[in-house]
Amino acid sequence: MNGAIGGDLLLNFPDMSVLERQRAHLKYLNPTFDSPLAGFFADSSMITGGEMDSYLSTAGLNLPMMYGETTVEGDSRLSISPETTLGTGNFKKRKFDTETKDCNEKKKKMTMNRDDLVEEGEEEKSKITEQNNGSTKSIKKMKHKAKKEENNFSNDSSKVTKELEKTDYIHVRARRGQATDSHSIAERVRREKISERMKFLQDLVPGCDKITGKAGMLDEIINYVQSLQRQIEFLSMKLAIVNPRPDFDMDDIFAKEVASTPMTVVPSPEMVLSGYSHEMVHSGYSSEMVNSGYLHVNPMQQVNTSSDPLSCFNNGEAPSMWDSHVQNLYGNLGV
């Protein structure tokens, strides 16, 4: 504590040189050197003399080298003039001035940047507000258009309903693209015809009146028709057994007779009539009488081909053929 107080007093002493002040400051920072230097600081002549320098050199302290200073002309004493002290002070002032200028410039730049950021933020806000206003306007336009379309659609639908109310007939559901008045009328007529035919079939088929539904009615009608077919087949078989008849192939018999007879040209009725009329014209009859209805000629009297194939039944072989056919029928029936 005593060393620190002494250092403060020495620093505040007005007649001290710069070196003395530096040494006192060193003493203040390193109080361990208080005891050996107390005698030297007690006498000011020793401080100004060379004993202090020699003692510091023996102690291993070289203050001028520590503070970056040099001696003048090899003298052990330090030569520090007031001009050098003033130069260092001016340098510090200049450095402080430059630092203050840099700080001011930085502050100005910061303020400018802040102003720019504020302006950019305001511009962005204005753009966003403009976009929002534009979007709101577009939304309003879309809503207005939608309202107009709804009104138009409602008007069209009201017109369509009025037109439908004017029609007297019942509209029938049709396919896409065919929902017209003519189509609906034709469909109604077709269904009416179908319903009439179904009623007629119900009257024909016994027990079909009790069935409800078109599918059931159709099934019942089909079953009834099938039963009728079976009954007809059974009755035809009974008739064939009771009244047997020869089963001849008339086409084969006629072909055989034609093949056996010689090829002769049979004049057609038209040829006969044309030749007869020609002869009558030459004999003195007028053409009007020939073409008129005075002549009544039956062409079937001249050419009779329908009775010729049946001439085979007049032979004596007919009963034997009948007996053989009857026996074949009985054999097939298992009698």
From Swiss-Prot:
Tissue spec. comment: Expressed constitutively in roots, leaves, and stems.
Start and end residues of each stretch annotated as Disordered: 110-160
InterPro entries named among the record's database cross-references: bHLH_dom (IPR011598), bHLH_ZIP_TF (IPR024097), HLH_DNA-bd_sf (IPR036638)
GO molecular function per UniProt: DNA binding; DNA-binding transcription factor activity; protein dimerization activity
Induction summary: Accumulates strongly in response to blue light due to reduced preventing 26S proteasome-mediated degradation in an ADO1/ZTL and ADO2/LKP2 dependent manner, but levels decrease in the absence of blue light via 26S proteasome degradation (at protein level).
UniProtKB keywords: Activator, DNA-binding, Flowering, Nucleus, Transcription, Transcription regulation
Subcellular location as annotated: Nucleus
UniProt-listed CDD domains: bHLH_AtBPE_like
SUPFAM superfamilies the record matches: HLH, helix-loop-helix DNA-binding domain
Span of domain bHLH: 178-228
One GO BP annotation of this record: flower development
GO cellular component term, pick one: nucleus
Applications reported: The blue light-mediated interaction between CRY2 and BHLH63/CIB1 is used to design an optogenetic control of target proteins or organelles.
Pfam families in the cross-refs: HLH
Gene3D superfamilies: Helix-loop-helix DNA-binding domain (4.10.280.10)
Complex and partners: Homodimer. Interacts with IBH1. Binds reversibly to CRY2 after blue light illumination.
Job of this protein: Transcription factor that binds DNA to G box 5'-CACGTG-3' and, to a lower extent, to E-box 5'-CANNTG-3' in vitro. Binds to chromatin DNA of the FT gene and promotes its expression, and thus triggers flowering in response to blue light.
Protein name: Transcription factor bHLH63
Organism, as annotated: Arabidopsis thaliana
